[in-house]
């Protein structure tokens, strides 16, 4: 946290894609570029050619939260290498979570100091944005939460074989590995045993850049698997044939598998107690309910949204999230016909700031 001025102990957890970062149609983005709009930052193209944008105002509002002593955390299901590549364009945060909760990193501004857990090869140089204070441009390294890593890398979870040493390079993901990733068939741990079982059934698995999770994408499957993928999604939602030690979440035709102690809600539980160790004793659910806001948009955010005090949805990408918003007064959609994408994100952040301000004045 950049300040401890806030007397109201609150934290904000935010998803990234569809929440802070948006993907306008190519023609709209090109028009913005032609108009030389400097209130938007353009992220590097993804492997599929998509290019996200984040607004300068979004970045300023996130920094305002931190200036008021509110811990701000980015929580994504993306692989760690993807998160590392995008960090220069994202809000500075008090913690960064990748792989659906599997890995936690903290910023370290002492870039020349070697500390336990430092991520080799990652030095983040933040990109400037409109209204950016000079302090936001200071480079930083990342330090992994070794307590969390030690728990999640035991053999009942993900094991230790998925971790690789990284080195920066030019390229689509910005990183290469100094140690080649261990193939799935050589990885120990309950997670990878399940992965091998799914491979035997014909599923194509994506484990590149993941140490504590893997993804199954409908688009990557052979025709016979793709034709019955909806049934597979339903089975996963019902936890059919999912080992007790594992968790899973579905989103936009993908399924992520990870250790049961992982997942977005569980990592939020862990971090809120780390930020506020005395909050509400040891009652995890009350701690999040009383002290956390979240920003999110899709199916793999549902548990996190329900666990927090209030969830704000700048966009809604699934019917289940739309239904959740209609059924719960604590799930608020900020998107309207006139206010979409970055404008809806900015509105959500302003609502959180206003609520915190009211709480502080009581």
Where are these regions (language model features)?
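Short glycine-/acidic-enriched loop or helix-start segments at secondary-structure transitions
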Residues: 23-24, 30, 83-86, 107-108, ...
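Catalytic phosphate/metal-binding cores of nucleic-acid and nucleotide-processing enzymes, i.e., regions
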Residues: 16, 36, 91, 300-302
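Active-site neighborhood of HAD-like aspartate-dependent phosphohydrolases
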Residues: 7-12, 16-74, 80-82
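Acidic, Mg2+-coordinating phosphoryl-transfer loop and its flanking beta/alpha structural elements
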Residues: 76, 268, 291-336
């Amino acid at each position: 946290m950049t300040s401890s001025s806030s007397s109201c102990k609150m934290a904000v957890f935010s998803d990234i894609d569809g929440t802070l970062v948006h993907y306008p149609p190519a023609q709209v983005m090109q028009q913005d570029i032609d108009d030389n709009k400097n209130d938007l930052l353009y992220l590097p193209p993804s492997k599929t050619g998509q290019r996200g944008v984040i607004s300068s105002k979004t970045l300023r509002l996130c920094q305002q939260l931190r200036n008021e002593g509110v811990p701000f955390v980015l929580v994504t299901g993306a692989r760690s290498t993807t998160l590392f590549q995008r960090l220069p364009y994202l809000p500075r945060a008090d913690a960064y979570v990748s792989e659906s909760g599997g890995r936690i990193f903290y910023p370290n501004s002492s870039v020349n100091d070697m500390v336990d857990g430092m991520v080799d090869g990652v030095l983040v140089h933040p990109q400037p944005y409109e209204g950016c204070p000079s302090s936001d441009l200071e480079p930083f390294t990342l330090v992994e939460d070794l307590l969390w890593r030690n728990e999640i890398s035991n053999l009942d979870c993900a094991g230790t074989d998925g971790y690789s040493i990284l080195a920066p390079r030019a390229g689509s993901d910005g990183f290469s590995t100094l140690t080649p990733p261990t193939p799935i068939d050589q990885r120990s741990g309950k997670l990878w045993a399940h992965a091998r079982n799914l491979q035997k059934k014909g599923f194509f698995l994506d484990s590149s850049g993941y140490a504590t999770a893997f993804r199954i994408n409908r688009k990557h499957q052979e025709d016979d698997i793709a034709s019955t993928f909806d049934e597979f999604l339903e089975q996963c939602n019902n936890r059919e044939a999912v080992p007790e030690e594992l968790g899973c979440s579905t989103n936009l035709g993908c399924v992520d598998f990870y250790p049961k102690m992982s997942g977005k809600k569980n990592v939020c539980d862990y971090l809120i107690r780390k930020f506020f160790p005395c909050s509400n004793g040891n009652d995890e659910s009350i701690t999040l309910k009383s002290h956390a806001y979240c920003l999110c948009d899709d199916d793999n955010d549902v548990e996190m949204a329900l666990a927090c005090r209030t969830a704000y949805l700048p966009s809604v990408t699934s019917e289940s999230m739309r239904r959740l918003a209609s059924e719960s007064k604590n799930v608020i959609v900020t998107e309207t016909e006139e206010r979409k994408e970055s404008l809806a994100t900015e509105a959500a952040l302003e609502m959180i700031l206003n609520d915190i301000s009211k709480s502080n004045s009581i």
